[in-house]
Amino acid sequence: ECADKVRDEIKEKNGNDILLFYNDYSSFQTEKRDHICELIKEINSEEKLCDGMGMQSYIGGWADNDADRQNGCFSPYDLSNHKEAVEKYSALGVEVHITECAIRNFYNTESALKKHKEFYVKFVKQIEELNSGSTPKITNFSIWGLTDLPSTVTDSNYSYTMNGPYAGLYTSLNESFTYTKKDVYYAILEELNN
């Protein structure tokens, strides 16, 4: 209610067109998604106060150790959950923003980096498919954790578990922090240009 009043006052005073979003993490997980849908329905029951849904999308790999974390990465289940969540939020008549997309990866092996790249491309293709109709379902896509973090954080660090040390589109080959684009960067760019 307070955010709605502030929005209306700013619109009236400055003529700005402001949209209010509900933004939350793990919003593609089934149970949480369903609760959020009910919340948005309730908020918008009398008049449209919530204009959009912000999906913080930290995908894959929650566990206590790297081996289990890595086993939780690149799951087709996460892709289908994310797609279903976007469709459900969009069906409520609100814009959908992917506000923080981090496809987690905890290993710097050739195999893990290849799977990371392939999963990211599948995720971007899914966004393109969701937006292929006359009205886009996703109006913003922001990638979170652009760079790898292997030498700057330990496995007990929040950033390590949130993003994964090798989840970036760029990597530093040495301690000079000179960043190089990874194969995943070029694969995403190629998909977006097709």
Describe the predicted segments one by one.
Residues 1-23, 29-108, 124-134, 138:
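Glycoside hydrolase catalytic-domain groove-lining segments
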Residues 25-30, 146-150:
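Short, internal active-site loops enriched in acidic
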Residues 74-88, 92-97, 105-194:
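Aromatic-rich peripheral "rim/lid" segments of glycoside hydrolase catalytic domains that contact
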